[in-house]
């Protein structure tokens, strides 16, 4: 069954190459996690996939049809991202009610009842201006648009970033329900690989301007270990291991590595633990 396909996508901003010859096939009816550190090119790739940002070279197709400048193909794809001063749907000084109305025009399969139910469930005041919403409410509004769009392929950029733990769990349950009941495809970007365990069927990791790996989540996590602590200690611990993701969290350094042979892995003390000793 056809889906969304990227072929040899490259993109640079002035002299900074962000994506280099990226090829990727997204099958229909799956939940994908797009993982990589901040600044690795996740948002750039997603915006190219949805025709919002032209690539320097390569092509994107949906069911064999070009996505760029193709309204029919794009009508099956929703890219819902953090709302900025000026967003896809207009100025964010509009009230939530008007913002949702504009979304209903843009997405042909818009589910008004779902949007209304989710707005009530998450306590969003429709009379409030979008620009006056908290970060958590902005994230939830982004999620609502993605879900209520009913697009066959729905792409969400760091949707859980502003959500607390309870709401985040409810969000992921909604995603899983939509995929199981309606066969929708979701691509969800995050820099937190631990979120993959119970949600994503496949994980795509961007690193060094390209797709570093694409693998079944269960199989990948069986091979991986998460190591965190003082940067020097962590680097010594994983020396010689295949690092698939890394991030700095305050003064701590965390990496996800592939278990490889006799590579010794351990979690070193955090800076706070070190200060206490």
Named regions from a protein language model:
Residues 171-187, 191-257:
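ABC transporter nucleotide-binding domain
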Residues 266-273:
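Conserved small/polar residues in nucleotide/adenosyl-binding loops
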């Amino acid at each position: 069954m056809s889906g969304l396909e990227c072929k040899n996508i490259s993109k640079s901003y002035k002299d900074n190459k962000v994506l280099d010859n990226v090829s990727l096939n997204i099958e229909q009816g799956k939940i994908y996690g797009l993982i990589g550190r901040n600044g690795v090119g996740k948002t750039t790739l997603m915006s190219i996939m949805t025709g919002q940002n032209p690539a320097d070279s390569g092509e994107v197709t949906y069911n064999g049809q070009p996505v760029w400048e193709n309204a029919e193909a794009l009508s099956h794809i929703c890219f819902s991202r953090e709302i900025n001063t000026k967003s896809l749907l207009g100025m964010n000084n509009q009230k939530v009610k008007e913002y949702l109305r504009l979304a209903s025009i843009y997405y042909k399969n818009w589910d008004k009842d779902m949007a209304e139910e989710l707005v009530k469930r998450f306590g969003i005041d429709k009379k409030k201006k979008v620009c006056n919403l908290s970060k958590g409410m902005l994230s939830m509004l982004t999620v609502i648009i993605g879900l209520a769009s009913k697009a066959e392929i729905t792409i969400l950029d760091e949707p859980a970033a502003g959500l607390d733990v309870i709401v985040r769990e409810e969000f992921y349950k909604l995603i899983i329900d939509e995929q199981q009941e309606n066969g929708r495809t979701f691509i969800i970007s995050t820099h937190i690989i631990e979120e993959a365990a119970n949600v994503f069927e496949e994980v795509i990791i961007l690193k060094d301007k390209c797709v570093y790996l694409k693998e079944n989540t269960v199989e990948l996590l069986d091979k991986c270990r998460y190591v965190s602590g003082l940067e020097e200690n962590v680097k010594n611990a994983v020396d010689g291991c295949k690092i698939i993701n890394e991030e700095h969290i305050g003064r701590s350094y965390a990496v996800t590595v592939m278990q490889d042979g006799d590579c010794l892995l351990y979690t070193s003390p955090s800076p706070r633990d070190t200060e206490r000793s």
